[in-house]
């Protein structure tokens, strides 16, 4: 899966502008206003958090590595740029994206095993018929035009670790930030190297204490990011300002020489801050109830 990102289908076909994503979602709403009225759903980022938590539960049951879960999240996002979520069974889409991602990331799971474990988690929404996952897999592949290779920021993070002399704590936090970016639209908006650089900046500026446990997410530093996020943005935007600490100065100097799109890095940081703000409203119970009501009312669980 180490093909060149710059020649990839991800770069050519699966990067959008914010305006284009908004147009796509608005078009879904215009086509079926009744469903949007009768079946209100939480903020997309809250749904992303819910889907991510469900994927983690499924992945843990089968000891799946993080990159396969990340690929599954990208597949789900891509699929929902082509399909209105209210016309689907999201649990089936999630299960199928997981199954397909495991194959693509070379850690395949048998379809019967995946269906069995998914049914153990969501028995009211996943039927025992494995052909349903097979049909959904065909739909996923078709909607993505068989463009299934996903380039992730994890690789860039690993490559930059020695160059930027990142500590193990900084790498762990940057990894967690990368995990969290899949809860936003960022994977549809920017190349993976932009996300990796953003994650490194966050990790260096908000260096975690040895007592901080991230458990795969950087949410524990949300408050610090909200309070200090604008200072980071100012430091990155204004190279001539009062000097930040030497560690951050070194990072800013590297950024200036690297020709990385700093505007994109800043926008990505702002998106992450926004995610952590909306996360405070997250309710797993609410997401589950609203999705369940929609699925049962529209008989999407059959």
UniProtKB/Swiss-Prot annotation:
Residue ranges annotated for the Cyclin N-terminal domain, each copy included: 53-142
Gene Ontology biological process: positive regulation of transcription by RNA polymerase II
Annotated GO CC locations: mediator complex; nucleus
Keywords tagged on the record: Activator, Cyclin, Nucleus, Repressor, Transcription, Transcription regulation
One Pfam family named in its UniProt record: Cyclin_N
GO molecular function terms noted in the UniProt entry: cyclin-dependent protein serine/threonine kinase regulator activity
SMART domains in the cross-refs: CYCLIN
Major place of residence: nucleus
Localization, UniProt: Nucleus
Top-level lineage group: Eukaryota
Protein family membership: Belongs to the cyclin family. Cyclin C subfamily.
PANTHER family according to UniProt: CYCLIN
Role description: Component of the srb8-11 complex. The srb8-11 complex is a regulatory module of the Mediator complex which is itself involved in regulation of basal and activated RNA polymerase II-dependent transcription. The srb8-11 complex may be involved in the transcriptional repression of a subset of genes regulated by Mediator. It may inhibit the association of the Mediator complex with RNA polymerase II to form the holoenzyme complex. The srb8-11 complex phosphorylates the C-terminal domain (CTD) of the largest subunit of RNA polymerase II.
Assembly notes: Component of the srb8-11 complex, a regulatory module of the Mediator complex.
Protein's name in the database: RNA polymerase II holoenzyme cyclin-like subunit
Lineage: Eukaryota, Fungi, Dikarya, Ascomycota, Pezizomycotina
Gene name, Swiss-Prot/TrEMBL: ssn8
């Amino acid at each position: 899966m180490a093909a060149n990102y710059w020649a990839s289908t991800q770069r050519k076909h699966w990067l959008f502008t914010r305006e284009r994503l908004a147009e796509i979602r608005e078009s879904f709403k215009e086509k079926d206003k009744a469903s949007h009225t009768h079946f209100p759903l939480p903020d997309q980022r809250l749904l992303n958090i819910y889907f991510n938590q469900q994927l983690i539960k499924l992945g843990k049951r089968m000891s799946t590595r993080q990159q396969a879960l990340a690929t599954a999240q990208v597949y789900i996002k891509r699929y929902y740029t082509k399909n209105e979520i209210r016309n689907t069974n999201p649990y089936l889409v999630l299960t199928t994206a997981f199954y397909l991602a495991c194959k693509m990331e070379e850690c395949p799971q048998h379809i019967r095993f995946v269906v069995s474990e998914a049914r153990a988690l969501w028995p009211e929404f996943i039927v025992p018929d494995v052909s349903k996952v097979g049909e959904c897999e065909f739909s996923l592949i078709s909607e993505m035009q068989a463009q299934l290779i996903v380039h992730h920021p994890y690789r860039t993070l690993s490559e930059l670790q020695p160059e930027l002399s990142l500590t193990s704590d900084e790498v762990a936090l940057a990894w967690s930030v990368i995990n969290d970016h899949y809860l936003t639209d960022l994977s549809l908006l920017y190349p993976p190297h932009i996300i990796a650089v953003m994650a490194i900046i966050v990790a260096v500026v908000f260096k975690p204490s040895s007592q901080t446990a991230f458990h795969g997410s950087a949410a524990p530093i949300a408050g610090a990011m909200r309070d200090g996020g604008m200072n980071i943005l100012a430091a990155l935007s204004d190279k001539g300002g009062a000097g930040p600490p030497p560690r951050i100065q070194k990072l800013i100097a590297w950024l200036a020489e690297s020709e990385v799109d700093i505007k994109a890095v800043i926008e990505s940081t702002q998106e992450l801050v926004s995610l952590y703000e909306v996360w405070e409203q997250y309710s797993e119970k609410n997401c589950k109830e609203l999705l369940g009501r929609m699925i049962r009312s529209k008989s999407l669980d059959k």
